Amino acid sequence: YAERGYGVAAYDYEGYGQSGGEPSEAAACRDIERVWRYLVEERGVPPESIVIYGRSVGSGPSCFLAEKVPARALVLEAPFKSTFSVVGMGWLPFDRFRNIDRVAKIDLPLLIIHGTRDTVVPYSHGEALFEAAAGPKRLYTVEGGGHNNLLFKAGERYWETLREFLASPERKE
């Protein structure tokens, strides 16, 4: 992304990668809020220039944040409806990261990128989120794309789609 001119703020959620602690929905939401505050309050990045980008499990905290802040747009790559819907436990009452409920409340322009051969988070999740989304939205389907190869599979079309979306996202008033 940086090579294409996009500024990137990447971090590890608590309990993942180089971060200590235990992973949880609450911790992931706190972490993404901290990153937002750091960018806006300490670095002086205008909120309307920030694109929230969540990939796979990152779609949960990204949807959480997008409900609360005046960002430029939200991009979700290989997102899920909810965590338990991915692992076949959607009937439990304490499901986590219910993106399917959140996207209906998000006013930001939304781009969903999903591959038709994703065996981790089925393509149907991306379709369902697209249908449930309230604001301006676009679904970019990567034919034959899996969970971890969308950029590779789509090639230059991936970047063209992202560039076109970010060039003219419409805010819902």
Task: Please place each PLM-identified region on the residue numbering.
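C-terminal catalytic histidine-bearing segment of alpha/beta-hydrolase fold enzymes
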Residues: 127-131, 135-173
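Membrane-embedded segments
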Residues: 1-38
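Active-site nucleophile loop of the alpha/beta-hydrolase fold
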Residues: 71, 75-85, 95
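Acidic catalytic loop of the alpha/beta-hydrolase fold
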Residues: 116-121, 148-149
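Short alpha-helix in the alpha/beta-hydrolase fold that links the catalytic acid
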Residues: 108, 122-131
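Alpha/beta-hydrolase fold nucleophile elbow
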Residues: 44-56
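Short beta-strand/loop motif that positions the catalytic acidic residue
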Residues: 105-107, 112-114, 118
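Short beta-strand immediately N-terminal to the catalytic nucleophile in serine-hydrolase-like folds
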Residues: 51-54, 77, 113
